[in-house]
């Protein structure tokens, strides 16, 4: 079984994550030391400020710079953290933003109160476009005023729910997250790492916290998800 970090910003100079190759290599070495086998590189994609073709080109260039260092780092798979936008379920090129070789899309939901149309868009991504949707850092959307019923509707869809590792260390949030993992409404962990000194690679801390609370076998199940 491979240990996978499903959410990271380790590619240099492409978003608000790593600023340069040196930082990227440092982050990736930290991940290797923590036992991570596969890093899903998920730079931010915002449809209102980027074209898919240009994004994919920039992502490939950033990846090539990292690989040119020939460092001992985890295997990197290309993906994106796709910010929700109106019409996403009808956008023609979003298939290029899935995790390479799969139909899996890491989707960042709106940071405002959702709506029926948002729920319908997610449903259409699944049912009409046949994407497997991972909801990025679900914990950030649970406390948005008026969001409870919409979150519940989305969680009733066949989605995978990702939780940031740091949330499992936060005394204000970890109880709810452990409960979600226990009842099957949260499924995987991501570090959402952005740098060497801020929002650092910390997948192992989240895995350790989950293991202490729910058991080592439970964490191993995540690795087979």
What is each PLM-predicted segment?
Residues 203-225:
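Mid-to-C-terminal alpha-helical segments outside catalytic/metal-binding sites
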Residues 46-49, 83-85, 140-144, 168-171, ...:
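Active-site environment of divalent metal-dependent phosphoester hydrolases
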Residues 1-72:
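An N-terminally biased module of ancient metal coordination in phosphate/nucleic-acid-related enzymes
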Residues 4-6, 39-42, 77-81, 134-136, ...:
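Active-site neighborhood of phospho(di)ester-bond hydrolases with catalytic His/Asp-centered motifs
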């Amino acid at each position: 079984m491979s240990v996978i970090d499903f959410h990271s910003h380790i590619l240099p100079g492409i978003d608000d994550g790593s600023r340069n190759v040196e930082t990227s290599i440092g982050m990736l070495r930290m991940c290797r030391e923590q036992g991570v086998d596969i890093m899903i590189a998920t730079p931010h994609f915002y449809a209102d400020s980027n074209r898919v073709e240009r994004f994919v080109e920039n992502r490939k260039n950033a990846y090539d710079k990292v690989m040119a260092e020939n460092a001992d780092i985890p295997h990197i798979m290309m993906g994106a953290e796709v910010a929700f936008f109106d019409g996403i379920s009808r956008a023609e090129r979003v298939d290029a933003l899935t995790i390479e070789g799969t139909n899996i899309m890491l989707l960042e939901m709106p940071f405002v109160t959702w709506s029926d149309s948002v729920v319908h868009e997610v449903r259409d991504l699944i049912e009409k476009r046949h994407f497997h949707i991972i909801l990025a850092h679900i914990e950030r959307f649970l406390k948005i005023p008026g969001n409870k019923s919409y979150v519940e509707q989305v969680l009733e869809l066949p989605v995978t729910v990702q939780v940031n590792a740091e949330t499992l260390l936060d005394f204000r949030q970890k109880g709810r997250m452990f409960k979600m993992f226990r009842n099957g409404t949260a499924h995987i962990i991501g570090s959402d790492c952005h740098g060497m000194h801020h929002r650092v690679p910390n997948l192992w801390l989240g895995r350790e916290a989950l293991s202490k609370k729910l058991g080592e076998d439970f964490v191993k199940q995540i690795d087979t998800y």
